[in-house]
Amino acid sequence: MQKWNRHSSLAASAMVALLVTGCGGGGGGGSPTGQTYSATCADGSGKTSTVSAADAAAQCPTATYSAICADQSTVTSNTSQAAANAKCTPGIVAKVVASTYTGEKLAAFNQLNADRAQCGFGQLQQNAKLDVAAQGHADWLAANPFLAASHVQDPSTGKGVVTGVQRQDRLQNAGYIPTPWVNYLGTFSSTEVIGVPAWGTALSCKYCANNASFGNTELSVGNGVRQLYATVYHLVDILKGERDVGFGAAIADSSIIGVHTRYIKKVVIDPATAQGWVRQSIPSDTILTFPCQGITNTTPVFRGEDPEPFPSRGSKEYGQPVYVMGADGTTVTINAASSSITPLGGSPVATTVFNSAVDPLPPTDGRNVKNNQVFLVPTQRLLDNTTYTVVLNGTNTGMVTNANPSGAYSRTFTFSTLTPTTF
């Protein structure tokens, strides 16, 4: 798998443009020089005045910025989109309209939303325009299977229908964000995650040594979601606070891929938040985890991802990461000495803490983990069909109070793995 910038935010604002024009002849009233002052307003309309440029600008309609909060309430501001967004209190989406998906897409959508809701990340709403963008990219990847999980549609391959070279292009072409960017007063954010859930008997990746337990071929979109859970960067993306989502899935032509069955299925998930909608968020004194209490059927093997968070790992198998997230702007830590992941009736597994301090991606790379994101990662494969108890101890700057000056937190919960051959 490969991933794109973890958060892409674009904004544009229209400015009032003033134009002074000279007029011939004399006359009373208005400008003593006969000048006409023009103003181009933020909404594209024009106003004129014979008094002054300020008077022309004052005739422009007042812009109103609106935002739809996570609780579905609407707030407005005459100042800016950011000011409108700031009026929303932190919150998550508890319920969405039933999707129109069928088959494996429906199962995967329901699974993702159920898991997000169970762990407190909030649900995503199906968006038909994002479906178009995601399906278009899945189809292009299926026509270009050896590009694995590229986020760029290269027209020079001559294969498949190019629906947008970059992710932003695909969202624009699908109508999710404006084209062109004229008088665009808001912001949008989006992430694209791509899963390749097929493995088959011809395992050809460096992570596949000793992975016979992956079984033969598993092509479901739901398995693609589960494999995205067993990652670091992609797990962050699939649990981000976006409002909408689109699913795409396609199977490559077997005559192209030959025996390399790991390239056969492409699953594209496009979470995003459109202009005028506010992303889901949590209060500063809150932490969320994934897995969380009661999550089942997680993949016992960390299968690697691109970019690779553990460059020195080589082909060594790791286990399902445990993700801890605080609110934006906070710093969250895990105390490795007092945190553990333990199988029922067994001993704690070896783990490592992954955070922004050890992330191999530089701070300038938008895909890197942030200070409010930290992982406890098993440095060995977890057992199939096994219940694990997770004990987490650490700190969260958003939880600092007089009674809790260090911002300490403690969490204990259980989750379980599945047997990969029974996906």
Give, region by region, the residue ranges found by the protein language model.
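Functional surface patches built around histidine and acidic residues
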Residues: 34, 64, 81-340, 369, ...
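Bacterial N-terminal signal peptides that target proteins for export
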Residues: 2-12
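Acidic, low-complexity Ser/Thr/Gly/Pro-rich repeat segments typical of extracellular/periplasmic
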Residues: 309-423
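Secreted, short cysteine-rich peptides and small extracellular cysteine-rich domains stabilized by multiple disulfide
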Residues: 56-59, 68
